[in-house]
C-alpha cells in the first residue's frame, strides 16, 4: 500500500505544568500550520489558531490533524477562517482529525464554517478518544457556497463521520451524508427548507437530562427571535448533541456561543473568550 501523501498535516500535544496548559511536540507542514498560542484575557487556557495557508481545499487534497491532551490539560482550538471546499471535478477532499484526551482534560474546538462550493466533494472523519473523566466541546457548521445558477445545494456531497470513544468503547457513531444528487436536501427529514446546519457535541461526567433541559432553556428564545430549528438530545453516554437548522451562519454561531457560554459558566466557572479573527 502506497504511503499517504498529505497536502497538510499537524500534530499538537498540550500538557499542564501545574499553573497553566502549554504545548509541546508541535509539528506541521505544507498547507497546515498552527499559530503560537494566545492566552486571551490572561486565561491559563491557551487558544490555538489552525490555519490553511493555501486559502482553501482543492481537488485531491488530503489533510491530517492529531491533537493530544495530557492529564489535566485544557485547550481551545479554532480555525482562522472558513474552510472553503472548491469544485472537485476529478477527485474529492479528505480530512482526518484525531483527538486524544487524557484524564481530567478538556478540549474546546470551535471551528468556522465549512463552505462547500459548486461541484465540491468533501469527506471528514473525526475520532475522539476520551477517558471517563475527560471532556470536550466540538462544533461544526455546514453551509453551501456560491453557485453559478444561484441555487443553494450545488455541491456533490459533504460526508462527515464522528466517532467518540470513552475508555476505548465506542459510544457515538454519527454518519452524516448530505448529497443533493441522491436526496432532496430541502425536504422533510433533511434540511426542511433551511440551508445551513450547525452541530455540537459536549461530553462531560456532569451531563444528565437536567443539564440538557437547562441548555435548551438557555437557547429556546432563539426560535422565537429567528427562523431556525434547534434540537438537543442526550447521547448514549454522559454527553449531548446539538443540531441547528437555519438560513444564516451568524444565527448558528450565536446559538453555539450561548451553549458554550452556559457550559463554561456552569461547569468551569469562567467566561468564554472572544476569538478575535479580524
From Swiss-Prot:
Q: How does it assemble?
A: UreD, UreF and UreG form a complex that acts as a GTP-hydrolysis-dependent molecular chaperone, activating the urease apoprotein by helping to assemble the nickel containing metallocenter of UreC. The UreE protein probably delivers the nickel.
By what name is this protein known? Urease accessory protein UreD
Q: Which GO terms describe its molecular function?
A: nickel cation binding
Q: Which domain of life is it from?
A: Bacteria
- UniProt gene name: ureD
Q: Which family does it belong to?
A: Belongs to the UreD family.
UniProt source species: Staphylococcus epidermidis (strain ATCC 12228 / FDA PCI 1200)
- UniProt key word Lipid biosynthesis: no
Q: Which Pfam families match?
A: UreD
- Which cell locations does it reside in? Cytoplasm
Amino acid at each position: 500500500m502506497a504511503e499517504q501523501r498529505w497536502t497538510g498535516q499537524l500534530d499538537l500535544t498540550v500538557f499542564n505544568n501545574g499553573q497553566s496548559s502549554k504545548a509541546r511536540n508541535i509539528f506541521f507542514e505544507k498547507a497546515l500550520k498552527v499559530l503560537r498560542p494566545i492566552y486571551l484575557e490572561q486565561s491559563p487556557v491557551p487558544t490555538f489558531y489552525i490555519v490553511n495557508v493555501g486559502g482553501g481545499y482543492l481537488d485531491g487534497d488530503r489533510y491530517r490533524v492529531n491533537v493530544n491532551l495530557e492529564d489535566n490539560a485544557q485547550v481551545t482550538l479554532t480555525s482562522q477562517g472558513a474552510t472553503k471546499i472548491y469544485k472537485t471535478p476529478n477527485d474529492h477532499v479528505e480530512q482526518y482529525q484525531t483527538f486524544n484526551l487524557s484524564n481530567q482534560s478538556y478540549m474546546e474546538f470551535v471551528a468556522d464554517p465549512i463552505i462547500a462550493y459548486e461541484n465540491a466533494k468533501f469527506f471528514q472523519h473525526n475520532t475522539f478518544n476520551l477517558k471517563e473523566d475527560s471532556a470536550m466541546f466540538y462544533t461544526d457548521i455546514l453551509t453551501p457556497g456560491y453557485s453559478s445558477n444561484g441555487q443553494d445545494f450545488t455541491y456533490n456531497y459533504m460526508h462527515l463521520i464522528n466517532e467518540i470513544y470513552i475508555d476505548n468503547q465506542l459510544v457515538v457513531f454519527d454518519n452524516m451524508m448530505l448529497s443533493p444528487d441522491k436526496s432532496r436536501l430541502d425536504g422533510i427529514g433533511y434540511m426542511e427548507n433551511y440551508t445551513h446546519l450547525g452541530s455540537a457535541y459536549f461530553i462531560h461526567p456532569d451531563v444528565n437530562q437536567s443539564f440538557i433541559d437547562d441548555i435548551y432553556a438557555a437557547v429556546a428564545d432563539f426560535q422565537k427571535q429567528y427562523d431556525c430549528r434547534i434540537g438537543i438530545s442526550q447521547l448514549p453516554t454522559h454527553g449531548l448533541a446539538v443540531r441547528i437548522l437555519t438560513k444564516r451562519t451568524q444565527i448558528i454561531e450565536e446559538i453555539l456561543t450561548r451553549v458554550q457560554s452556559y457550559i463554561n459558566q456552569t461547569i468551569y466557572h469562567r467566561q468564554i473568550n472572544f476569538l478575535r479573527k479580524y
